[in-house]
Swiss-Prot record:
The lineage of its organism: Viruses, Riboviria, Orthornavirae, Negarnaviricota, Haploviricotina. Residues 364-429 form a coiled coil. Phosphorylated by PKC/PRKCZ, and other unknown kinases. Phosphorylation is necessary for viral transcription and replication. The N-terminus contains the majority of phosphorylated sites. Ser-249 is the major site of phosphorylation, but is not necessary for most functions. The P/V/C gene has two overlapping open reading frames. One encodes the P/V/W proteins and the other the C/Y proteins. This is Phosphoprotein. It comes from the Viruses. Its main location: host cell. Belongs to the respirovirus P protein family.
Length: 568
């Protein structure tokens, strides 16, 4: 079957769906089987009819009318029918993946749009104005030469031969869908619902997906038989309410201390009677229940009565256990483990509860059970204590680390304070011992530079006159001559002045200068030294106060000593 027959089939399918006639979905599935069982389109065949000139106005039968239930007439084209048929094929459960079907739909739609655009300029606004009609030819020429068959003829043939579905079975479509009962038809077409009309009729199963399970009488009988097997031993199960009152009511001659704890495992006979509902852990304990022990003379249906010697031994063991529990409480009180015997009785701790059970136990199996519980509860309490100690040690370690950090910062701060204090002391040492210079530096007595506030005798500043150079006073000599007198004494080359202007006139010496170049270079030497900032400031200040070369030399010797002490 070629593609023309496929498109015309799907067009007739959409016409029949939209005309208002109600069909069951089983017929739809049968029609899908007929479509899917056909041979695939020959891809390498002649498809030149797709590129013929399209003129939708010449072919009045290219579009058809579709009328909805509550809407007006809407004209649909073969492109939309083709798309809806493809979508119904995908939703019908074919074996090809959804991605291939979607790619084929897009490919077809692109071909139709390409032919529609290449036809003429008149077809473009027509395609854009009507969003659904792409202008494809309704009945393209049959160049393949295949015989055409109408959709109505095939539907009649499928209705006449219902067994043809099994013969025309497609790959991947399960047989259960084909043999199922007709599903109820939803009130909307698959073209509008994207093929989801089949979904509400299929029962959902979490284990088997994609297979429709139809309930049959045999299946119902099997389910009823399976449900009837559970209460099979109901006669033996009805015995349990008789045992419960005897378990709950203790005999009047025992006090509350002899009452057995409520968390007792059941008896061995209970395990044989109802093996399905009992946990696997309780099979190990084979002691008789407490109610049977405390009321031996009351016979119950299905339980043999215990002989009286065993009952007497049980009562005797319970009395002995009560006395031993009192002795244990007294011992624990005397050792200081607990405050009083009442605390041992009323304690809800797991170890105390298992210890009381072990002391009250009547046989070795019960005692072994309770001793195991006591050991496990003690081990659990020890593990909890170990965890608490680990948390405490972790907190202590964190606090120690924080203290180390604080101590480190404090030690750095202390070093900084010590260096500041030492610089202050060195400054004070320079001010007191090296300061307060007099005119005679050789005099042993040195007056401090810090004076009390007294009236100072201000010397009148004498104005410089060039005739003062000839006088014998050292202060009025020019600087170059003055430096030359001490040139032999200064061994350090730092003190040597650079003769920047050797041919300077005599008048350049008359200009007042605030600072000698030698003092300036010495200050630069001090500033570039590795001393602290306070020491540098103190030495520069003391250097500016010097009046003679001997004082400058003494200050620089101190600077050199400090630098050597730092470097060494």
């Amino acid at each position: 079957m070629d593609q023309d027959a496929l498109i015309s089939k799907e067009d007739s399918e959409v016409e029949r769906e939209a005309s208002g006639g109600r069909e069951s979905l089983s017929d739809v599935i049968g029609f899908l089987d007929a479509v899917l069982s056909s041979e695939p389109t020959d891809i390498g065949g002649d498809r030149s009819w797709l590129h013929n000139t399209i003129n939708t106005l010449q072919r009045p039968g290219s579009t058809h009318r579709v009328k909805g239930e509550g809407e007006g007439e809407v004209s649909t084209s073969s492109t939309q029918d083709n798309r809806s048929g493809e979508e119904s094929r995908v939703s019908g459960g074919t074996s090809e993946p959804e991605a291939e079907a979607h790619a084929r739909n897009v490919d077809k739609q692109n071909i139709h749009w390409a032919t529609g655009r290449g036809a003429s300029t008149d077809s473009v606004p027509q395609d854009l104005g009507n969003g659904r009609d792409s202008g494809i030819l309704e009945d393209p020429p049959n160049e393949g030469g295949y015989p055409r068959s109408g959709a109505e003829d095939e539907n009649r043939e499928m209705a006449a031969n219902p067994d043809k579905r099994g013969e025309d079975q497609a790959e991947g479509l399960p047989e259960e869908i084909r043999r199922s009962a007709p599903l109820p038809d939803e009130r909307e077409g698959r073209a509008d619902n994207n093929g989801r009309g089949v979904e509400p009729g299929s029962p959902h199963s979490a284990r088997v997906t994609g297979v429709l399970v139809i309930p049959s009488p045999e299946l119902e009988e099997a389910v009823l038989q399976r449900n009837k097997r559970r209460p099979a031993n109901s006669g033996s199960r009805s015995l349990t309410p008789v045992v419960v009152p005897s378990t709950r009511s203790p005999p009047p001659d025992h006090d509350n201390s002899t009452r057995s704890p409520p968390r007792k495992p059941p008896t061995t006979q209970d395990e044989h009677t109802n093996p399905r509902n009992t946990p696997a852990v309780r099979i190990k304990d084979r002691r008789p229940p407490t109610g049977t022990r405390s009321a031996p003379d009351r016979p119950t249906d299905g339980y043999p009565t215990h002989p009286s010697p065993e009952t007497d031994a049980t009562k005797k063991g319970i009395e002995e256990n009560t006395s031993s529990m009192k002795e244990m409480a007294t011992l624990l009180t005397s050792l200081g483990v607990i405050q009083s015997a009442q605390e041992f009785e009323s304690s809800r701790d797991a170890s105390y509860v298992f210890a009381k059970r072990a002391l009250k136990s009547a046989n070795y199996a019960e005692m072994a059970f309770n001793v195991c519980g006591l050991i496990l509860s003690a081990e659990k309490s020890f593990a909890n204590r170990v965890d608490e100690n680990k948390q405490l040690l972790k907190q202590i370690q964190e606090s120690v680390e924080s203290f180390r950090d604080i101590y480190k910062r404090f030690s750095e701060y202390q070093k900084e304070q010590n260096s500041l204090l030492m610089s202050n002391l060195s400054t004070l040492h320079i001010i007191t011992d090296r300061g307060g210079k007099t005119d005679n530096p050789d005099s042993p007595t040195r007056s401090p530079s810090v004076f009390a506030k007294t009236k100072e005798n201000k010397t009148k500043a004498t104005r410089f006159d060039p005739s003062m150079e000839t006088m014998g006073d050292m202060r009025y000599k020019p600087d170059l001559l003055r430096e030359d007198e001490f040139r032999e004494e200064i061994r350090n080359p730092v003190y040597q002045e650079r003769d920047t202007e050797p041919r300077a006139s005599n008048a350049s010496r008359l200009l007042p200068s605030r600072e000698k170049p030698t003092i300036h270079s010495l200050k630069l030497v001090i500033e570039s030294s590795p001393l602290s900032r306070a020491e540098k400031a103190a030495y520069v200040k003391s250097l500016s106060k010097c009046k003679t070369d001997q004082e400058v030399k003494a200050v620089m010797e101190l600077v050199e000593e400090d630098i050597e002490s730092l470097t060494n």
